[in-house]
Amino acid sequence: MPRTPHLLAIQSHVVFGHAGNAAAVFPMQRIGINVWPLNTVQFSNHTQYGRWTGQVLPPEQIPALVDGIAGIGELGNCDAVLSGYLGSAAQGRAILDVVARIKQANPRALYLCDPVMGHPEKGCIVAPEVSDFLLEEAAAVADYLCPNQLELDSFCDRQPNSLADCVEMARSLLARGPRAILVKHLNYPGKAGDTFEMLLVAADQAWHLQRPLLAFPRQPVGVGDLASGLFLSRLLLGDDLRNAFEFTGAAVHEVLLETQACGSYELELVRAQDRIAHPRVRFDAVRL
């Protein structure tokens, strides 16, 4: 029987609803991953509600929790680290120390950085020190980097004029160290208004994926967290880059279809769980 992969997921958590680990952990488990959730913040709900309660995890707790895992002899079983929303730059540096420690224990372990800064329609939502950390430090360590358009623009200090520009910008990030760049949400002049587009770029390949853009009264939160988690999970389960990319696009679309059908603001992960594991739709990525 194949071994079940283990993944350390270090990002935000909400008690109510789905964002950060609350959006990613269950779907990753549902498709066959043992997830170790480590929450950088614990809030009552996501911040787009306009009010919330909760607190940021002190940075020193991150290595302390990993010490506990090492103490029971399990650290070498970690196959990947996923990082997302950070409450502070100090948290980010603690995560990079953890990544180095895990890679020492398991040299094959992967690190996917979801450089959460904000959203093209909402602007930057993190402190400048967090943005600086992601731009200047995290990208050099990540095996996979998963920005949205705002974050890609921030990394490259420019905005695209076309899809070709987006490819060029993503490819320029490979020089910093990542094996591949997954742009989870493209937005560029000339883009069709009725499609949602994603981009995957590696040294020897570039793939473009389009799916229908679904309308919501309020855009659900956590879609990017879901996408990053599914993409890394499928890589751990043996998919190549293209297949992991196509699976991610299909599974996320299935969740959004269920969410739209229910008239929900929060992602309908539980109702869509079988469609996450076995998407009924598939969108073919086009090689560029």
UniProtKB/Swiss-Prot annotation:
<feature type="binding site">
    <location>
        <position position="114"/>
    </location>
    <ligand>
        <name>ATP</name>
    </ligand>
</feature>
<feature type="binding site">
    <location>
        <begin position="47"/>
        <end position="48"/>
    </location>
    <ligand>
        <name>substrate</name>
    </ligand>
</feature>
<dbReference type="GO" id="GO:0009443">
    <property type="term" value="P:pyridoxal 5'-phosphate salvage"/>
</dbReference>
<dbReference type="Pfam" id="PF08543">
    <property type="entry name" value="Phos_pyr_kin"/>
</dbReference>
<comment type="similarity">
    <text>Belongs to the pyridoxine kinase family. PdxY subfamily.</text>
</comment>
<dbReference type="GO" id="GO:0008478">
    <property type="term" value="F:pyridoxal kinase activity"/>
</dbReference>
<feature type="binding site">
    <location>
        <position position="184"/>
    </location>
    <ligand>
        <name>ATP</name>
    </ligand>
</feature>
<dbReference type="InterPro" id="IPR013749">
    <property type="entry name" value="PM/HMP-P_kinase-1"/>
</dbReference>
<feature type="binding site">
    <location>
        <begin position="211"/>
        <end position="214"/>
    </location>
    <ligand>
        <name>ATP</name>
    </ligand>
</feature>
<feature type="binding site">
    <location>
        <position position="12"/>
    </location>
    <ligand>
        <name>substrate</name>
    </ligand>
</feature>
<feature type="binding site">
    <location>
        <position position="151"/>
    </location>
    <ligand>
        <name>ATP</name>
    </ligand>
</feature>
<keyword id="KW-0808">Transferase</keyword>
<dbReference type="InterPro" id="IPR023685">
    <property type="entry name" value="Pyridoxal_kinase_PdxY"/>
</dbReference>
<dbReference type="InterPro" id="IPR029056">
    <property type="entry name" value="Ribokinase-like"/>
</dbReference>
<keyword id="KW-0547">Nucleotide-binding</keyword>
<dbReference type="GO" id="GO:0005524">
    <property type="term" value="F:ATP binding"/>
</dbReference>
<dbReference type="InterPro" id="IPR004625">
    <property type="entry name" value="PyrdxlKinase"/>
</dbReference>
<comment type="function">
    <text>Pyridoxal kinase involved in the salvage pathway of pyridoxal 5'-phosphate (PLP). Catalyzes the phosphorylation of pyridoxal to PLP.</text>
</comment>
<comment type="subunit">
    <text>Homodimer.</text>
</comment>
<dbReference type="GO" id="GO:0005829">
    <property type="term" value="C:cytosol"/>
</dbReference>
<keyword id="KW-0418">Kinase</keyword>
<keyword id="KW-0460">Magnesium</keyword>
<feature type="binding site">
    <location>
        <position position="225"/>
    </location>
    <ligand>
        <name>substrate</name>
    </ligand>
</feature>
<protein>
    <recommendedName>
        <fullName>Pyridoxal kinase PdxY</fullName>
        <ecNumber>2.7.1.35</ecNumber>
    </recommendedName>
</protein>
<comment type="pathway">
    <text>Cofactor metabolism; pyridoxal 5'-phosphate salvage; pyridoxal 5'-phosphate from pyridoxal: step 1/1.</text>
</comment>
<dbReference type="GO" id="GO:0000287">
    <property type="term" value="F:magnesium ion binding"/>
</dbReference>
<keyword id="KW-0067">ATP-binding</keyword>
